[in-house]
Amino acid sequence: MEITVINGSPRLKKSNSEILKNYLLNFIKENKINEYFSFSIKLDNNIKTNIHNSDILIFIFPLYVDGIPSNLLSLLLNFENKKLINSKTKIYCIVNNGFFEGVQNHLAISQIRCWTKKVNAQWGQGIGVGSGELLSHLKKVPLGQGPLKNLGIALEKFSKNILSLKSDEDICINPNYPRILYFLQANVSWFMIARKNKLKFKDLFKKIYNK
């Protein structure tokens, strides 16, 4: 089976989407895998052929203003205009965000589902991952354990559906981590960044325009 995975994050290899991609690849690595970044992909004839011949097409990307990042959206339109998507191809997606709740990704998943219908392909499933900013801090934690327990369970089910070409209901997950602690750490990180840039605590509350 030929599987194409497209990372839709502008942060490329330094992105949380790349971390999620690598987790997923551990479940599906026995297949032929094509990997691309939507930000830098060049649609030459070889890549066009790979896209068209894919049994599975997986988009992994961050949530941008409740939707799809512009670089990935541009690529989707390109695929659509060039009629690259095979009607037999099954499409899946994983969306992550900086909010605690994974359900915040549901609109972006719906957008990919609608696009799938528009290009006459087959919809598989979507995963909405909350608290994506935690991922880079949990690289030493085994997938499926601790804060990554829910993610491990979701990716295992997701990968089984991929390998069996099965469609299923979308999954939205939160980390196995206290919500209040997540927000506390997020706020502290801003203070640390401010100090690193020689700013004071009060500088974080300055406004460009005063009424």
Label every model-predicted segment:
Residues 20, 28, 96-99, 120-122, ...:
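Iron-sulfur-associated redox domains of electron-transfer enzymes in respiratory
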Residues 15-16, 103-106, 139:
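Short, solvent-exposed loop/turn segments at secondary-structure boundaries
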Residues 2-30:
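N-terminal beta1-alpha1 ligand-phosphate binding loop
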Residues 23-33, 114-121:
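Short helix-loop-beta junction
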Residues 30-45:
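A short beta-strand-loop structural module common to alpha/beta enzyme folds
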Residues 127-211:
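Glycine-rich phosphate/pyrophosphate-binding loop and the adjoining helix
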Residues 41-120:
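Helix-loop-strand module that forms the ligand-binding subsite of alpha/beta enzymes
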